[in-house]
């Protein structure tokens, strides 16, 4: 059970209520004090007035019974870890002892109060300190028996002093409220309060004695069971606040605990039959008036309290009070205090129940919630039966109530984090192994739900892998599929290749396997419609199926047109495009016929200007591609029947247009056959060099996506480009330095002077001049300066150094010009330029 109360993944986020912080700070002190002081006065803080009346007469029987109850309380931790069979044994043994204990009910109630208080502190300790404290406390329970019995006989004055000390130290918020009401009617109110605390817990104990009702008691637990450490002090606070009269100070927590106690009571209709038989057998002789009092007081309080936790408080309080003292006064006092609070809390508890009702419906779990009407009606019958139960069950109830409140009160926190519910259902199946025998029906439901979801995930993962294999192929088939795709698009590469395609770098081809595997993983992640993101609990990262579908559509929109079903955004353009494609195919067919009949094939040439004009329109390019212009272009570029290439002008224009077209999908390339035509031109010996270059670029661009390589260098950052260059350099160096040349170390060591050059006659000496080794250094080509530097300073120094040479050269050039004669010798009148 400690594992249920404290699980590391659901740690306290401190988000419950402000009072929780006080409880957390007090919980450590309370747990430590209860372990260090076995008979500490806080155990007796609430039973002192009842001890005044009854302790003298029944201390011996009370101590004997307490040993039984203590033994039962120690056994309480074990049945939760083993099975509910032991729970039934414990309850039966307690029922057998009920006749002995009724004489000292108030004393037993007081000591049960101690046990419930001390049992709460381990739970708080489990949440706040460590999991070891409940274990230690379970051991210390048996050790504390004797000191508690001794201190039960202490003087009343000592108890008053110790009570005030313990109240101020540990449980000031809750127990001072108890003491406030104790001032009004001390003996009766204290007894009723202590029993009141036991009886609502008793309510929860029935639902816990048979663990299937435990889960039915908090149906939302099936959706979000162990958020257990979510509010550490809440497991104590709701129980104590049912005791306290000033409940309106903490309405929020009461609303939570109210709705949860209501749920636990509502679930007990499953166990009523068994309980009624056991309890009526044990208590018929003693508790007949109690039952009547309970039924009377319940009928008064039910109309107001059906949906609130005051239903648990008032009715259970009155029958338990009537066991010892006059029930009318206590019922009056309690109901006066409780009825206003009932009215206040009905609304809040109903709201919280409605919220909890909605959540299982939204999550579509298999344990449907009972309606609130059936809960309240079951509670009416159940409380009459439970009022007759002996008070010996109070101790058992206190511990089971504690765990029930822990699990139930967390449902509100679990509602805030509903994204984690599925994972919690799976973990609850593991955590609830402590209730293994009793929880089998519920665990079967949970296991079936978890197994169903796991099967769905497996199916989805299988379909994802299949779709990924369809898109990218498995690793074993990736190379074959790439080869097949290349063969389909560009044709089989036979031995008749005149020119080898050198489009790819070797590094790109080497890295293609890793790239394709990465792409496959990305595609599988993109195609996954599973709820893995939900299960991880990271709601921020979660993307709905609709978002994933949109992203897929966007990624496909570049390759495929969205509306291929005939509905287009430019209806008249479609007509133009289709007519153009029809004309192109007809012209190609006519040219083939003319060529086969040995006539000049000029139809394509005459139609070429019109085709180029339309294909260059930017807004029609996508429409052309979708309408099948690629197959028409292939018809124009394929050789004629006499194996002659089409006109050079046709090839040039169409290759340029193909280069300008947007990215073409692999399906289009495969079905149109344009790749084979381009590859034929690329390999053809009579094709012009510019056309071969364009064809090589096209092949490179179209085949890169098949190998998962990028062709967009503009999109690469500078660092990526530098990294790519660095990765390519060593292979180039290896390629350049490989060959039958002298080893590199000789030149390096000779140049550095470490090793002397080989002399003639020494091994390894070659008696001939050698070509120098290629450099092993990496040189990065420095690009031209795009920014004009301030060249004035450089120009000034250059002028000073070169000015004389420039002057002499200019003079020399001028003299040459003067000495040269024109075509006709001009005779100057003055005779200056006449040749002598």
Swiss-Prot record:
Compartment annotation: Nucleus
Compositionally biased residues, Basic and acidic residues: 20-36, 43-122, 133-148, 157-186, 206-218, 288-309, 370-386, 458-469, 533-542, 716-727
GO cellular component: nucleus
Family listed: Belongs to the IWS1 family.
Residue ranges of every copy of the TFIIS N-terminal domain listed in the record: 631-709
Pfam families: Med26
UniProt-listed InterPro entries: RNAPII_TF_IWS1, TFIIS/LEDGF_dom_sf, TFIIS_N
Superkingdom, natural source: Eukaryota
Protein name: Protein IWS1 homolog A
């Amino acid at each position: 059970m400690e594992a249920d109360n404290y699980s590391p993944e659901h740690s306290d986020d401190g988000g419950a209520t402000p009072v929780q912080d006080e409880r957390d700070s007090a919980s450590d002190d309370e747990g430590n004090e209860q372990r260090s002081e076995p008979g500490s006065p806080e155990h007796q803080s609430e039973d002192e007035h009842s001890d005044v009346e009854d302790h003298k007469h029944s201390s011996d029987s009370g101590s004997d019974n307490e040993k039984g109850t203590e033994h039962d309380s120690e056994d309480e931790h074990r049945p939760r870890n083993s099975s509910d069979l032991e729970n039934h044994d414990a309850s039966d043994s307690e029922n057998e002892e009920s006749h002995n204990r009724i004489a000292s009910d108030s004393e037993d109630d007081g000591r049960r109060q101690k046990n419930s208080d001390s049992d709460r502190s381990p739970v708080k300790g489990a949440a706040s300190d460590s999991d070891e404290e409940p274990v230690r406390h379970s051991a210390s329970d048996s050790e504390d028996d004797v000191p508690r019995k001794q201190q039960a006989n202490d003087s009343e004055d000592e108890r008053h002093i110790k009570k005030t000390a313990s109240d101020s130290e540990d449980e000031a918020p809750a127990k001072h409220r108890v003491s406030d009401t104790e001032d009004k009617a001390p003996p009766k109110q204290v007894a009723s309060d202590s029993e009141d605390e036991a009886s609502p817990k008793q309510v929860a104990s029935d639902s816990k004695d048979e663990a299937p009702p435990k889960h039915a008691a908090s149906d939302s637990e099936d959706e979000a069971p162990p958020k257990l450490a979510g509010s550490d002090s809440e497991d104590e606070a709701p129980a104590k606040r049912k005791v306290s009269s000033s409940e309106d100070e903490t309405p929020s927590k009461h609303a939570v605990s109210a709705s949860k106690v209501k749920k636990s009571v509502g679930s007990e209709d499953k166990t009523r039959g068994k309980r009624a038989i056991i309890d009526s057998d044990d208590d018929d002789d003693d508790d007949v008036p109690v039952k009547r009092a309970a039924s009377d007081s319940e009928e008064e309080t039910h109309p107001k309290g059906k949906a609130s936790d005051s239903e648990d408080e008032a009715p259970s309080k009155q029958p338990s009070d009537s066991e010892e003292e006059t029930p009318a006064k206590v019922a009056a006092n309690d109901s006066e205090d409780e009825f206003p609070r009932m009215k206040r809390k009905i609304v809040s508890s109903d709201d919280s129940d409605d919220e909890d009702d909605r959540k299982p419906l939204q999550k579509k779990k298999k344990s449907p919630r009972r309606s609130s009407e059936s809960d309240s009606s079951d509670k009416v019958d159940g409380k009459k039966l439970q009022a007759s139960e002996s008070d010996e069950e109070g101790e058992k109830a206190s511990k089971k109530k504690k765990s029930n409140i822990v699990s139930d009160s967390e449902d509100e926190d679990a509602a805030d984090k509903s994204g984690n519910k599925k994972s919690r259902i799976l973990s609850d199946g593991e955590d609830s192994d402590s209730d293994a025998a009793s929880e089998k029906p519920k665990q079967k439901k949970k296991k079936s739900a978890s197994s169903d979801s796991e099967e769905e995930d497996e199916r989805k993962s299988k379909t994802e892998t299949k779709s990924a294999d369809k898109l990218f192929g498995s690793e074993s088939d990736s190379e074959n599929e790439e080869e097949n795709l290349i063969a389909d698009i560009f044709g089989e590469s036979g031995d008749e290749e005149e020119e080898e395609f050198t489009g790819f770098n070797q590094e790109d081809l080497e890295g293609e396997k890793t790239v394709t595997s990465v792409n496959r993983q990305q595609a599988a992640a993109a195609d996954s419609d599973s709820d893995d993101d939900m299960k991880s609990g990271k709601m921020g990262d979660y993307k709905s199926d609709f978002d994933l579908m949109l992203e897929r559509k966007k990624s496909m929109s570049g390759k495929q047109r969205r509306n291929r079903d005939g509905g287009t955004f430019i209806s008249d353009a479609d007509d133009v495009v289709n007519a153009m494609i029809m004309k192109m195919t007809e012209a190609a067919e006519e040219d083939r016929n003319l060529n086969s009949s040995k006539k000049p094939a000029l139809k394509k040439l005459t139609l070429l200007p019109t085709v180029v004009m339309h294909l260059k329109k930017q807004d029609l390019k996508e429409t052309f591609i979708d309408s099948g212009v690629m197959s028409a272009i292939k018809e124009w570029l394929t050789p004629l029947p006499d194996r002659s290439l089409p006109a050079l002008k046709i090839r040039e224009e169409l290759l340029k247009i193909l280069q300008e077209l947007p990215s073409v999908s692999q399906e289009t390339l495969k079905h149109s056959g344009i790749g084979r035509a381009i590859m034929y031109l690329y390999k053809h010996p009579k094709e012009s060099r510019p056309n071969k270059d364009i064809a090589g670029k096209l092949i490179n661009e179209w085949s890169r996506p098949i190998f998962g390589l990028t062709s967009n260098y503009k999109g690469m950052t500078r660092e990526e480009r530098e990294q790519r260059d660095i990765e390519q350099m060593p292979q180039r160096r290896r390629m350049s330095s490989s060959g039958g040349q002298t080893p590199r170390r000789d030149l390096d060591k000779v140049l550095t002077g470490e090793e002397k050059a080989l002399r003639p006659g020494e091994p390894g000496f070659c008696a001939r001049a050698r070509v120098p080794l290629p450099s092993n250094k990496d040189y990065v080509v420095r690009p031209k300066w795009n920014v004009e530097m301030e060249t004035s300073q450089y120009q000034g120094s250059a002028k000073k150094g070169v000015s004389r040479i420039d002057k002499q050269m200019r003079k020399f050039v001028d003299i040459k010009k003067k000495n040269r004669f024109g075509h006709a010798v001009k005779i100057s009148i003055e005779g200056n330029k006449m040749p002598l």
